[in-house]
Swiss-Prot record:
Keywords: Hydrolase. SUPFAM superfamilies: Metallo-hydrolase/oxidoreductase (SSF56281). Belongs to the UPF0173 family. GO terms for molecular function: hydrolase activity. InterPro entries: Metallo-B-lactamas, RibonucZ/Hydroxyglut_hydro, UPF0173, UPF0173_UPF0282_UlaG_hydrolase. It comes from the Bacteria. NCBIfam families: PRK00685.1 (NF001911). This is UPF0173 metal-dependent hydrolase Minf_0129.
């Protein structure tokens, strides 16, 4: 597996011969590279919840590439009304199987509404399970006890956790989440994009190091091989 970071909570995952794109937010992200909007070619697009900073570029990328979009029932229904027919609805506790493995849609503790104010269903996260390893993407979430169950059900190789605080967990809560998940390493997401979620990088790294948790902060367009 190989992770490509595109800023905020947007990242790509190479798994098997497939490329998955999560929570596309590029054109409105001042820290991302706008050329990515025309160069990314995912086979699948995964959306954790309906907030603009996770869904803003899903439609243009899906229309250009014809990539199916996986998300909860309400979001996929809304996307169909926007003219996208290639949707794969899911909901909490459900999973779908693919050539590269299995995708589970799991709980997150967060709100969800769509850019036009429509109801966005319940926010979620994703666990991607394949022969190359297991990735947990928390989406936007608070610390929650369900993470202990995720760690019991899956041997998580890497957890992508929000660390910016204010709207999600901060660094301290992400450390507690990592212990609950019993994951092998953590990659931080959902930080620095806006003033309210800026973090001290060195302080965050030290806090994870003090807890003996391998931790990565990637720059935009930087990659991580698992």
């Amino acid at each position: 597996m190989k992770i490509h970071y595109y800023g905020h909570s947007c990242f790509g995952l190479e798994i098997g011969s497939s490329f998955l794109l999560f929570d596309p937010f590029i054109s409105q992200n001042p820290l991302s590279d706008p050329t990515l909007l025309d160069t990314l070619n995912p086979q699948y697009i995964l959306i954790s919840h309906g907030h603009f900073d996770h869904i803003a570029d899903a439609s243009p990328i899906a229309k250009r590439t014809q990539a199916p979009i996986l998300s909860n029932f309400e979001i996929t229904l809304w996307l169909e009304k926007q003219g996208l027919s290639q949707v794969l609805p899911m909901n909490l506790g459900g999973n779908r199987s693919f050539d590269f493995g299995k995708i589970h849609y799991v709980q997150a503790a967060h709100s969800s509404s769509l850019p036009d104010g429509s109801y966005g269903g319940t926010a979620g996260g994703f666990i991607v399970e394949g022969p190359e390893g297991i990735l947990y993407y928390a989406g936007d979430t608070a610390l929650m006890s369900d993470m202990k169950l995720f760690g019991e059900c899956f041997q998580i190789d890497i957890a992508l956790l929000p660390i910016g605080g204010t709207f999600t967990m901060g660094v301290d809560e992400a450390i507690r989440a990592a212990h609950l998940l019993n994951c092998k390493q953590v990659m931080g997401v959902h930080f620095d994009t806006f003033e309210a979620i800026k973090i001290d990088h060195e302080e965050a790294k030290k806090k994870f190091q003090d807890e003996e948790i391998p931790f990565r902060l990637l720059k935009v367009k930087e990659s991580l091989i698992l």
